[in-house]
């Protein structure tokens, strides 16, 4: 039996690199409340791990979609993992989710080994995408983007003195929590974004814990978007589609649900679509030569349209998420839906996270 697991703490688990990792409270809440999500794609005879079966059935039932798989709870897992047909499909692979199932009695031979998990972790480091994707993608005409790795506080200060308004990112972080905006004031940005003692402490903490910090110029963003992909681990890469999404303070809030042509039409209002096609082709080439023979699963490359003052350009790799993404969920929802949904949103109401679907007017 294949068991699906929504582990949104994945990015933080990569940072810890521990077999026994306890996520922060917000991450545990997200997993508890949205644990039903894999039921959207789980097939017949497959299970979806949730902490509260009744809550999961209620949340999924509100979507009005047929449930093909079944919800399973932690107390049922020891029996399920002993079945010879057991396999695990998490949101993202890390030592913590493997350790969780090893402690439940899952056979080690059915789970990824250290070599694979180390590959996922190192390739998920923001500096990997900056070096292996962003740098070669910048050769595509109509693109913009720069990212450097800082390993000392003085390197961060030096980058700020040159760029004046910058974005600092922890190498492994999730949904905006590891991102800080900084200005030295010379560009007219609010002084509240200055290099305060609190920010200095955060920078030193990130460097001490993760070994480095990513430094980028601040860009005047017009639109967030991404491209979703799948690698089969055998040298093949498949393009899944465009993801048009929204963020608030760097944290994901929702996705447009539409077919590819409608999304391209929206983006065509801002730029020449040939730029998108060139970026797409280049990413496929880069993924083929770098990870396609090892990584098996979905991944997303986040991008944005940027106003440089002179023109609108594409930042072709803000980050790469080597895991399932909400962008892929949106693509899948649009594919399976028979209803005129317009968008998908992650909400937080009455102390609980939820998935909301908006209808076209």
Enumerate the predicted regions with their spans:
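Phosphate-binding site of ATP-dependent enzymes
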Residues: 164, 195-253, 305-317
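C-terminal amphipathic "assembly/sorting" segment characterized by alternating charged
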Residues: 44-50, 341-361
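A long amphipathic alpha-helix within ATP-dependent nucleotide-binding catalytic cores
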Residues: 208-212, 216-220, 239, 251-312, ...
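Glycine-rich phosphate-binding loop of ATP-grasp-fold ATP-dependent ligases
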Residues: 147, 165-199, 225-226, 250-267
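Short, glycine/acidic-enriched loop or turn micro-motifs at the edges of active sites
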Residues: 172, 305, 322
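N-terminal-proximal low-complexity accessory segments that begin disordered
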Residues: 1-49
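ATP-dependent carboxylate/phosphate-activation module, predominantly the ATP-grasp catalytic core
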Residues: 229-285, 321-347
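Conserved N-proximal alpha/beta basic substrate-recognition cap immediately N-terminal to
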Residues: 28-41, 49-159, 174
């Amino acid at each position: 039996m294949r068991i699906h697991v929504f582990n949104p703490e994945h990015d933080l688990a990569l940072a810890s690199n521990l077999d026994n990792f306890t996520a922060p409270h917000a991450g545990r809440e997200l997993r508890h409340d949205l644990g039903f999500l894999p039921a959207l794609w789980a097939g017949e005879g497959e299970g979806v791990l949730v902490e509260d079966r009744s809550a999961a059935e209620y949340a999924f039932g509100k979507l009005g979609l047929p449930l093909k798989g079944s919800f399973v709870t932690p107390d049922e897992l020891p029996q399920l993992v002993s079945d010879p047909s057991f396999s695990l499909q998490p949101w993202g692979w890390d030592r913590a989710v493997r350790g969780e199932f090893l402690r439940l009695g899952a056979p080690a031979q059915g789970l990824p080994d250290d070599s694979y998990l180390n590959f996922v972790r190192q390739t998920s480091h923001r500096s990997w995408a900056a070096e292996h994707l962003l740098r070669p993608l910048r050769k595509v005409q109509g693109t913009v983007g720069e990212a450097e790795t800082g390993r000392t506080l003085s390197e961060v200060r030096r980058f700020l003195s040159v760029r004046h308004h910058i974005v600092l990112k922890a190498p492994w972080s999730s949904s905006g929590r590891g991102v800080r905006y900084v200005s030295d004031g010379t560009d007219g940005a609010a002084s509240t974004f200055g290099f305060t003692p609190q920010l200095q402490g955060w920078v030193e903490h990130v460097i001490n814990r993760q070994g480095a910090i990513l430094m980028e110029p601040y860009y005047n963003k017009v639109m967030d978007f991404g491209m979703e992909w799948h690698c089969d681990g055998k040298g093949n890469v498949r393009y899944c589609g465009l993801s048009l999404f929204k963020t608030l303070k760097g944290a994901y809030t929702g996705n447009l649900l539409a077919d590819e042509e409608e999304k391209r039409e929206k983006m065509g209002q801002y730029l020449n679509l040939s730029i998108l096609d060139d970026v797409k082709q280049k990413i496929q080439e880069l993924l083929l030569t770098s990870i396609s023979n090892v990584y098996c699963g979905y991944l997303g490359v986040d991008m944005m349209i940027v106003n440089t003052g002179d023109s609108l350009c594409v930042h072709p790799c803000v980050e790469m998420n080597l895991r399932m993404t909400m962008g892929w969920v949106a693509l899948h929802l649009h594919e399976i839906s028979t209803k005129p949904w317009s968008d998908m949103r992650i909400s937080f109401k009455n102390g609980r996270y939820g998935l909301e679907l908006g209808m076209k007017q």
